[in-house]
Amino acid sequence: MAEAASISQGIAERYATALFELSKETGALKTLETDIDALKDVLAGSPDLGAMIASPVISRGDQAKAVAAIAGKMGLSPLMTNTLALMSEKRRLFALPQVLSALAGLIAEEKGEVTAEVTAATKLSAAQAKKLAETLKAKVGKTVKLNTTVDESLIGGLIVKLGSTMIDTSVKSKLASLQNAMKEVG
């Protein structure tokens, strides 16, 4: 299974690099970024679309028609539309989520940004998110973009993952540490 994941990641990185370089050459990085965000939103909101791109049962022709219709309806750039058509023709649409993630990473790197994965017990307010982004920016020296998710099981606090660093200030982890300490004592 790990081998399949690395194969699809390799495919995704090749498509992402090619699309990124072409967009950079033509000065269309902002358009590409808009397309990526739109596609991520559509994939997140449509389990049927996710199933369609992952299904080996659906023919190339049907996938190509569906992708062309979706791209047209969304108003995606010609470069993204052509890339989706090529991926459909080559039966590589299953790697689309990884392509989008790799593209977002390349664009962020180009802009000097890093992305922090933040898991909070409750939804962060705009002021809290801004303060956290500023604090992380001071720490890493780059603009920080936050991807936030809510996990009520944390009880309180945050878990921040930035690159290979993880900061866990959640009540859940504090309670687990206390529980382990109590087991050692008694």
From Swiss-Prot:
GTP-binding as UniProt keyword: no
Cellular location(s):
Cell inner membrane
Q: What InterPro entries does the record tag this protein with?
A: ATP_synth_OSCP/delta_N_sf (IPR026015), ATPase_OSCP/d_CS (IPR020781), ATPase_OSCP/dsu (IPR000711)
Task: Tell whether Lyase is among the UniProt keywords.
Answer: no
Cellular component GO terms, alphabetical: plasma membrane; proton-transporting ATP synthase complex
Task: Give the matching Pfam families.
Answer: OSCP
Query: What are the coiled-coil residue ranges?
Result: none
- Stored NCBIfam families: ATP_synt_delta (TIGR01145), PRK05758.2-2 (NF004402), PRK05758.3-2 (NF004406)
Xref: HAMAP family: ATP_synth_delta_bact
Q: What does this protein do?
A: F(1)F(0) ATP synthase produces ATP from ADP in the presence of a proton or sodium gradient. F-type ATPases consist of two structural domains, F(1) containing the extramembraneous catalytic core and F(0) containing the membrane proton channel, linked together by a central stalk and a peripheral stalk. During catalysis, ATP synthesis in the catalytic domain of F(1) is coupled via a rotary mechanism of the central stalk subunits to proton translocation. This protein is part of the stalk that links CF(0) to CF(1). It either transmits conformational changes from CF(0) to CF(1) or is implicated in proton conduction.
Mind telling me what this protein is named? ATP synthase subunit delta
Q: What is the species of this protein?
A: Fuscovulum blasticum (Rhodobacter blasticus)
The gene for this chain is atpH
